[in-house]
């Protein structure tokens, strides 16, 4: 999928992080919808045509893995990337997400992971699963 046509929903409760991520992704050709909380994020997810979600792990009221689980029940075809300021998360926290990055990783990692997620949407299930497995095994190393 072309970046210029991809709409990314970013959910982050820290305004500075949300604004920085939005500006960075827009600079690289993405359309970005931003939400500073869970309710706002879920409303945008349901009402807009979203190609991928970039979701903070630690949100007030509910962790990102639980939000991702709700989103997957609503639309399992939208890839979700979970970001965390904390190191690797246990595998059970990653069940409903398609990619995991720590916030300390360089922004270029976000770009390449996002493009991989968008490209993987059209791949057969096994190819998507293999990419996810490779990514998760690198995170836990």
Per-segment meaning from a language model:
Residues 60:
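The feature encodes the CheY-like receiver
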Residues 34-52:
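Acidic, metal-coordinating helix/loop segments flanking the phosphotransfer/catalytic sites
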Residues 12:
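Conserved acidic carboxylate
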Residues 121-141:
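CheY-like receiver
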Residues 56:
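Active-site residues of response regulator receiver
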Residues 15-33:
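Two-component/phosphorelay signaling modules centered on CheY-like receiver
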Residues 37, 63-66:
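Acidic catalytic/metal-coordinating carboxylates
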């Amino acid at each position: 999928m072309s970046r210029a046509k991809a709409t990314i929903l970013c959910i982050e409760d820290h305004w500075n992080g949300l604004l920085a991520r939005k500006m960075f992704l827009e600079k690289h050709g993405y359309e970005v919808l931003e939400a500073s909380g869970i309710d706002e994020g879920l409303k945008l997810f349901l009402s807009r045509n979203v190609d991928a979600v970039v979701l903070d792990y630690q949100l007030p009221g509910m962790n990102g893995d639980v939000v991702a689980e709700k989103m997957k029940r609503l639309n399992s075809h939208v890839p979700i990337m979970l970001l965390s300021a904390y190191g690797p998360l246990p595998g059970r926290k990653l069940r409903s997400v398609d990619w995991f990055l720590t916030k300390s990783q360089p922004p270029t990692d976000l770009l390449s992971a996002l493009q991989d997620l968008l490209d993987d949407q059209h791949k057969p299930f096994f190819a998507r699963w293999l990419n996810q497995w490779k990514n998760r095994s690198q995170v836990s190393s």
